[in-house]
């Protein structure tokens, strides 16, 4: 009997017949066995949580299930009959649809076009029926309790709204199996509640749902069953109602994670960055803050509070309407990201795949991009210098990769985050802004990233850390600023921290 390949067992009363089974699935890449004989079963009307550290094999399983990869070994059964997915369309035709962590949408298309791309309703003479597209899109969005206009372009939406469009797109296909890969990563609590109401409705319709999340509170709230992957194997499966969280953590990482927030005590130095009366035309106003040498300043708030917009302005992505910025006591005017980088301010964005990385390029080139003047000789790039720079920061960050020449897109989320941080550290900054630094990262990798952030602060780097995860703010920050609707709603020293204080400030419930 192999403990690594347990199939989820359900009581006969709940649902004796799985709609989908994967048996003995193995996926082999050059030098790597990404999946090793895993079994999993999904049942109608039930949510199964797929849990594991980044690199455990979850993404590979999803790609097999959605027809992107064909397994080297094993079989997929749909209603007890073997099926073979040769393409993503084969999987869709069989009733399998996916909502991915990084929204795969098109900025220049309308919301309705994105929802029905590839399966647009057509009218007479085979022409696309735009009226029907927009009507159906509006109905789907209303089911998600969203008032997004289907006719506007996607690029005009916020990250949270983009995720709702991605969910609507998945629901636009008549699916029996719905895969949700970190669907709540950019959603507010209200939007998560709305999504979970949708999930409950899908369960009542008999949909089988595979739910991938690193947020244990969400897993226990929405799922009935779980399957834990580690190092390409299934190491545990069962019913969440009878399994404590500590047991799942041990299965995930193969060890106890006792210190998720390894914050080092640091003697803070002088003020490095000072912002006064800083305002944007629409996103934030009257922001004043100071950041000291070696300090981790947490920015907390709900989605849409203006935190990312503030930091993007400090990095030169957008222009402020008014206000002053000083760095090391000297006035600073930032008109572009180049100005910020030259001054020593860098920004690690929330959406790594869209703004932080060139996913098709190798690791070493991604890491050296902001430091081309240091890796070139007489105006010409040298691969040797690029590799040397990448090796230095890959070692420092404990980057897990087969080689520095592999595309960044092949890495797990945690390792992609290390590449983004590494490329900016190579510029030797004074201030680093981390926007949701552990978004989509598993619990083991989170602890590693937190440890590294703490080390950077201990070395004297000044850090602004945006996070929507309250435990992360409380565990890692020396000081926390709460924003609400573009304004500063509160500022707290570490000794004053409490979850209640920060949540009240963020929600306006005094």
From Swiss-Prot:
- GO CC annotation: what is one? plasma membrane
Source species: Agrobacterium fabrum (strain C58 / ATCC 33970) (Agrobacterium tumefaciens (strain C58))
ABC transporter domain: which residues? 20-256, 266-510
The entry's protein name is Ribose import ATP-binding protein RbsA 1
Q: Where in the cell is it found?
A: Cell inner membrane
Q: What is its EC number?
A: 7.5.2.7
Q: Please give the family membership noted in the entry.
A: Belongs to the ABC transporter superfamily. Ribose importer (TC 3.A.1.2.1) family.
Query: How does the annotation summarize its subunit structure?
Result: The complex is composed of an ATP-binding protein (RbsA), two transmembrane proteins (RbsC) and a solute-binding protein (RbsB).
Which terms are listed as keywords in the entry? ATP-binding, Cell inner membrane, Cell membrane, Membrane, Nucleotide-binding, Repeat, Sugar transport, Translocase, Transport
Q: What does this protein do?
A: Part of the ABC transporter complex RbsABC involved in ribose import. Responsible for energy coupling to the transport system.
Q: What class of enzyme is it?
A: translocase
Q: Which GO terms describe its molecular function?
A: ABC-type D-ribose transporter activity; ATP binding; ATP hydrolysis activity
For the ligand (ATP), the binding residues are: 52-59
Which reactions fall under this protein's catalytic activity? D-ribose(out) + ATP + H2O = D-ribose(in) + ADP + phosphate + H(+)
**A Pfam short name:** ABC_tran
Q: How does it sit in the membrane?
A: Peripheral membrane protein
């Amino acid at each position: 009997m192999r403990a690594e390949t347990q199939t989820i067992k359900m009581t006969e009363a709940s649902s004796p017949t799985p709609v989908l089974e994967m048996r003995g699935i193995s996926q082999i890449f050059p030098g790597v066995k990404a999946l090793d004989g895993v079994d999993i079963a999904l049942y109608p009307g039930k949510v199964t949580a797929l849990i594991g550290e980044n690199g455990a094999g979850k993404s590979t399983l999803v790609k097999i299930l959605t027809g992107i990869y064909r397994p080297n070994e094993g079989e997929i059964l749909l209603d007890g009959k073997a099926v073979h997915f040769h393409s993503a369309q084969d999987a869709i035709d069989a009733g399998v649809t996916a909502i991915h962590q990084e929204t795969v949408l098109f900025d220049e298309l309308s919301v309705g076009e994105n929802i029905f791309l590839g399966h647009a309703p057509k009218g007479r003479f085979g022409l696309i029926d735009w009226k029907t597209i927009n009507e159906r899109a509006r109905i789907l969005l209303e089911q998600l309790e969203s008032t997004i206009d289907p006719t506007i372009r996607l690029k005009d939406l916020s990250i949270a709204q983009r995720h709702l469009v991605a969910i609507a797109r998945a629901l636009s296909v008549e699916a029996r199996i719905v895969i949700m890969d970190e669907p709540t990563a950019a959603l507010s609590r209200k939007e998560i509640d709305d999504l979970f109401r949708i999930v409950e409705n899908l369960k009542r319709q008999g949909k089988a749902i595979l739910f991938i999340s690193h947020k244990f509170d969400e897993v226990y709230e929405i799922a009935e069953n779980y399957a834990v992957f580690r190092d390409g194997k299934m190491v545990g499966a069962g019913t969440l109602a009878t399994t404590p969280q500590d047991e799942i953590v041990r299965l995930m990482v193969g060890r106890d994670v006792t210190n998720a927030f390894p914050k080092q005590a640091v003697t803070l130095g002088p003020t490095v960055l000072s912002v006064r009366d800083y305002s944007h035309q629409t996103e934030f106003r009257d922001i004043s803050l100071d950041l000291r040498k070696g300090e981790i300043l947490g920015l907390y708030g709900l989605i849409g509070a203006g935190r990312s917009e503030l930091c993007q302005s400090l990095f030169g992505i957008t222009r402020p309407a008014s206000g002053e910025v000083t760095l090391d006591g000297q006035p600073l005017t930032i008109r572009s990201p180049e100005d910020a980088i030259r001054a020593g301010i860098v920004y690690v964005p929330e959406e790594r795949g869209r703004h932080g990385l060139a996913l098709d390029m190798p690791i070493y080139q991604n890491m050296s991009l902001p430091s081309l003047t240091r890796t070139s000789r007489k105006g010409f790039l040298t691969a040797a210098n690029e590799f040397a720079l990448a090796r230095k920061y890959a070692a420092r960050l404990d980057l897990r990769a087969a080689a520095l020449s592999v595309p960044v897109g092949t890495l797990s989320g945690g390792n992609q985050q290390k590449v983004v941080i590494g490329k900016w550290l190579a510029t030797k900054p004074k201030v680093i802004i981390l926007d949701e630094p552990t978004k989509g990262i598993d619990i083991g990798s989170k602890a590693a990233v937190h440890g590294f952030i703490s080390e950077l602060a201990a070395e004297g780097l000044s850090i602004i850390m945006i996070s929507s995860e309250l435990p992360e703010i409380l565990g890692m920050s020396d000081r926390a600023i709460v924003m609400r609707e573009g304004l500063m709603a509160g500022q707290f020293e570490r000794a004053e921290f409490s979850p209640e204080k920060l949540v009240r400030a963020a929600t306006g419930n005094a």
